[in-house]
């Protein structure tokens, strides 16, 4: 309000179809909606980068932490790569045949689920595991660059965070095994979970 000299008070109600606490960026979606809505309401003429920055501030207010990757995707749509310090957002176009399937389990999400999920991540990792994850992340980017859905999906392999968190999702290993057997190229935890996301194509 101070930056833009807005004197009005405002009450915002958001109706969305993103369940809170299921690893799908619910708080980021709310923050992005507020940033985009206020930009239009007050004709602030913010750039995409500014919208992402302010949405990040909004998410910190609601969720306690900024997730620029989540708010950037919510503001810009599609897929993004985010660099920080300084903040830089790169939007990337997916292959036309890429399909993502999200399974949302009927679970009662515990209080402070994201904080608990973060606590499960190891503080130290082996060099070999780090190399594997960086290699797979590079494979995902290469898949987008080549518009190759299979390469993207087969590169969705996480040997650090997924093993540390999967015990919090009942039946995760069985769901992943069955999805891969059904033709998915890759399966992993969506965000901090407990939703599970599978990557495939129109074949």
Predicted regions and their residues:
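A short glycine/serine-rich beta->alpha loop
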Residues: 16-25, 58-66, 123-128
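DPxDG-like acidic metal-binding loop motif
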Residues: 26-48, 75-77
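Active-site rim beta-loop-alpha module in soluble metabolic enzymes
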Residues: 102-167
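Alpha/beta catalytic cores of group-transfer enzymes, especially the acyltransferase/condensing modules
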Residues: 48-98, 187-189, 193, 197
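Phosphate-handling active-site elements
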Residues: 2-9, 38-54, 86-88, 203
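Short beta-strand-to-loop capping motifs
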Residues: 84, 105, 198-202
């Amino acid at each position: 309000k101070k930056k833009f000299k807005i004197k009005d008070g405002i009450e915002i109600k958001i109706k969305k179809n993103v369940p809170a606490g299921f690893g799908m960026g619910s708080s980021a979606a709310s923050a992005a909606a507020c940033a985009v809505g206020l930009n239009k309401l007050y004709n602030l003429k913010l750039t995409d980068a500014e919208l992402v920055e302010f949405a990040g501030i909004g998410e910190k207010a609601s969720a306690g932490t900024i997730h620029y990757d989540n708010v950037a995707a919510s503001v810009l749509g599609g897929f993004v790569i985010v660099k920080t310090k300084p903040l830089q957002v790169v939007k990337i176009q997916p292959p036309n045949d890429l399909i993502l399937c999200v399974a949302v389990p009927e679970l009662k999400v515990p209080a402070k689920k994201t904080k608990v999920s973060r606590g499960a991540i190891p503080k130290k990792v082996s060099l070999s595991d780090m190399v594997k994850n960086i290699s797979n992340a590079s494979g995902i980017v290469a898949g987008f660059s080549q518009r190759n859905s299979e390469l993207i999906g087969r590169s969705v392999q996480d040997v650090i965070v997924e093993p540390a968190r999967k015990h919090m999702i009942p039946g995760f290993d069985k769901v992943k095994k069955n999805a891969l057997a059904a033709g998915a190229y890759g399966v992993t935890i969506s965000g901090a979970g407990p939703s599970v996301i599978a990557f495939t194509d129109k074949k």
